[in-house]
Amino acid sequence: MSLASRFLALALCVALYAADKPVSKPVEKDVPRTELHTLIVPGAALKFNFPELTVDRRGSLAAGNLKLPANYDKAKSYPLVVWLGGGEGGNTPDGSFLPAGDFITVGLPYPKGANKPAQANMVGDYAKVWTYQRFMLDEIAKVIPNIDRSRSIIAGFSNGAHAIDGMLRVSGGPKLTEYFGIFIFVEGGGTGYSSLGELPDLKGKLAYACWGSEKGSNKPNTSFLPAALKAKGATVIGSEMVGVGHGFSVSEQRKIAEWLEKVALAKK
């Protein structure tokens, strides 16, 4: 075998070894909240851990994932957009229903054990949920103080919308309306257990409630929300998603984005 052939064979062996060798991935390190301010740059993705709180409904460390806008400037103020997921929830932000613009987005979880008494798979102890999430919001504001609460949005699907309805009605202490000016209910809220108690004064607030038209939707409950919210002074849009069951259609996401851009945020 010639010298060139030997070098070629050796190179092939090295290449095959490299291909079989596992690729090392960078280790993600959790950063304490007290140090997160050092990571604030335009477009940053920040994970807020809350080890002092009970675990979330999935049994994981209480945490919220937050995304800063690409044009973030500490000298400007921005609306915070909180997303509350359906089912067991989660902590991933969702901006699918937002118009073009600069928003701080975050996903917040539900605490373990905050169940509806007769149905453990449903969030139901809204006072506990609000105490849990209010702590998170206050801690986020310590790191990112330039949040414009009057333009901030809380939105949720299914269990998330139930939770918004329920938290609005929690009496005593700081209220949900002190943190947000816009409320979006998707296929949730208006149920016999989420609507227990009185709604607060909603004058100057805006809300959008939507529900599916098909079997399996929350139409029998959510469709009653617009009238209840209007009775307390809110400016409300009620919308039926034609051909949709228990879901959040892309067409409805676009309608909400247009409403936010031309109405809700334009008024703020």
State what each model feature region is.
Residues 177-261:
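The feature captures the conserved acid-bearing segment of alpha/beta-hydrolase catalytic domains
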Residues 77-79, 102-103, 151, 181, ...:
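Alpha/beta-hydrolase fold active-site loops
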Residues 19-78, 159, 227, 237, ...:
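A domain-start/cap signature at the N-terminus of enzymes
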Residues 80-137:
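Active-site machinery of serine-nucleophile hydrolases
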